[in-house]
Curated annotation (Swiss-Prot):
The lineage of its organism: Eukaryota, Viridiplantae, Streptophyta, Embryophyta, Tracheophyta. This is Dolichol-phosphate mannosyltransferase subunit 1. It catalyses: a di-trans,poly-cis-dolichyl phosphate + GDP-alpha-D-mannose = a di-trans,poly-cis-dolichyl beta-D-mannosyl phosphate + GDP. CDD domains: DPM1_like. The gene is DPMS1. Mn(2+) binds at D106. It is a peripheral membrane protein.
Length: 246
């Protein structure tokens, strides 16, 4: 589907997929396989930004490089955990695509949606296409009621205070025109999970065209969630900061 749309537009675009990792040894090979499966006719590269995982994630990525090629799988490791926001910035420095996709490594963002992201962008010429759990066709699988209420509440609070123009402000599965991402990311100051929220708010304030694609978010299959109390506090601080500065 994505390849057909590219052909109609004549130009063959390249996509850089940035995947930050920390202790994702059990997931990274699966998500890479699924990306190749769903983007068979698309020109893309996968940039893995690993923050010094002690579980052997980097060794698995190196094996994937031997299988798929170092030109398709790029490992850009860092010595320690430096924050999600800086991981995107680090990956962006090495991206050679016309577009940049950011997604999680834990299989909560299924690569089967990537063709829909690409199709939506090509049809609308949007600067940003973001996945949303909160429109018809979207949803969440694997969360308990408390987690769903917390996520929904955080999103409603942000919507009420910030008016971002998108239905899922706290989502982190997005496609950007590279030039738009470079512009937006240069004005962001957050480093952790609130970075995603800041990027979409800054993009809205700058007037970028944003489209949405419904997705079903699936709770991680292997490993444990890295979202805890400190991230919730960080989110609330970030919300106040954005309210005062945007």
């Amino acid at each position: 589907m994505a390849d057909e749309m590219e052909t109609k537009g004549e130009k063959k675009y390249k996509y850089s997929i940035i995947i930050p990792t920390y202790n994702e040894r059990l997931n990274i090979a699966i998500i890479v396989y699924l990306i190749f499966k769903h983007l068979r006719d698309v020109d893309f590269e996968i940039i893995v930004v690993d923050d010094g995982s002690p579980d052997g994630t980097q060794e698995i990525v190196k094996q994937l490089q031997q299988l798929y090629g170092e030109d398709r799988i790029l490992l850009r490791a860092r010595a320690k955990k430096l924050g999600l926001g800086t991981a995107y910035i680090h990956g962006l420095k090495h991206a050679t695509g016309d577009f940049v996709v950011i997604m999680d490594a834990d299989l909560s963002h299924h690569p089967k949606y990537l063709p829909s992201f690409i199709k939506k962008q090509l049809e609308t010429n949007a600067s940003i296409v973001t996945g949303t759990r909160y429109v018809k066709g979207g949803g969440v699988h694997g969360w308990n009621l408390m987690r769903k209420l917390t996520s929904r509440g955080a999103n409603v609070l942000a919507q009420t205070l910030l008016w971002p123009g998108v239905s899922d402000l706290t989502g982190s599965f997005r496609l950007y025109k590279k030039s738009a991402l470079e512009d937006v990311i240069s004005s962001c100051v957050s480093k952790g999970y609130v970075f995603q929220m800041e990027m979409i708010v800054r993009a809205t304030r700058k007037g970028y065209h944003i489209e949405e694609v419904p997705i079903t978010f699936v709770d991680r299959v292997f490993g444990t969630s890295k979202l805890g109390g400190s991230e919730i506090v960080e989110y609330l601080k970030g919300l106040v900061y954005l309210l005062l500065t945007t």
